[in-house]
Amino acid sequence: WMESGGPVFDSQTRVGERGRHFTLTKFRSMRVDAEKGGVAVWASKDDDRSTRVGRLIRKTRLDELPQLIAVLRGDMSFVGPRPERPQFVDMLNDEVRYYGVRHSVKPGLTGWAQLRYPYGASVRDAEEKLKFDLFYVKNHGLVFDLMILLQTVEVVLFGRGAR
């Protein structure tokens, strides 16, 4: 936005609990033309579509702050599987067994998979992350959520695991 013009916020449709679509808003970290033709593209670790400011706010996770609105609206929780875009969900439902089970709980700002698996941008990565998401679905509760939140604070404050 400061470097590349365009809006400060980026809003996308995401898939939440029970497959319900909702709008997720983030601070925009990529160029305005990052997805030419409207085709969804997974972001990669060192994505060249990111702006300089975008790389900084992604590394510090500040780009995620506006998602608190989705938590207040009830579309998301603080902890749960990260919500994906409908295009990716459709593909992953076809290619990854049990992928839809992750939608039996609200998506979260942070999750077990984000703490346990490095940043990924492929079907194979989605399969690996799903193992952690399914573990969360089966075992979620107050104590587990608090543990995930505390570990997330460590990641944000000390940069461990930040992309």
For the regions a protein language model found, what residue spans apply to each?
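Gly/Ser/Thr-rich helix-start
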Residues: 6-7, 17-20, 55, 75, ...
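Short, glycine-rich, amphipathic interfacial segments at transmembrane boundaries or analogous
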Residues: 10-49, 110-131
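Intrinsically disordered, low-complexity segments enriched in polar/charged residues with Gly/Pro
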Residues: 1-2, 17, 89-91, 101-102, ...
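A generic fold-level signal
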Residues: 4-7, 45-48, 71, 107, ...
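A short, structured surface patch at a secondary-structure boundary
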Residues: 43-106, 148-156
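C-terminal terminal-structure detector
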Residues: 94-163
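A hydrophobic, helix-centered structural microdomain
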Residues: 1-33, 70, 142-163
